Amino acid sequence: MRNPYFDWIPFKAAKGEILTVRFDRPLVPRSVHRGIWMAPTEDPAVYRVGSTYDWKHLDQRTTLEARGELETKLLSFIKLPFAVENHEAAVRPIIQESKALLGLHPANERLGYFNGLGSKGSLHAPWFAACFRDYLVHGSPLPSGCDLRKNF
């Protein structure tokens, strides 16, 4: 799971489980983050819901415990019936400080890095992408909090 070009960036692995759920009717197509995230799909009645964090069991097996956790959290803010259509698990890298990192490799400027968004940060992905674009195309500075070269 280590990237040989960016192996100096500290991260840890976590297993996460997500659900694909179908509601009885279409919902307003927007992403929500309330302890878990809920993101729309092409079908306005179907959403992806996640994610759990398991730091010990780094496998791709789904668990009833994680499914129950996600269903309970979803029901805490969406008071509508839903059916679980799919349940998936995967191991993902988590930037240790849970922050976005952008920039070019210090020794090879042909290698770019755009990572660390996480579920909350993904809501800001368009802004981070615009910052990275301006950095690459116009030479604009990256925000200091996410500049790869200033943080490591």
What is the predicted function of each stretch?
Residues 83-152:
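C-terminal catalytic lobe of FAD-dependent flavoproteins
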Residues 1-109:
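Active-site substrate-recognition segment that forms the wall
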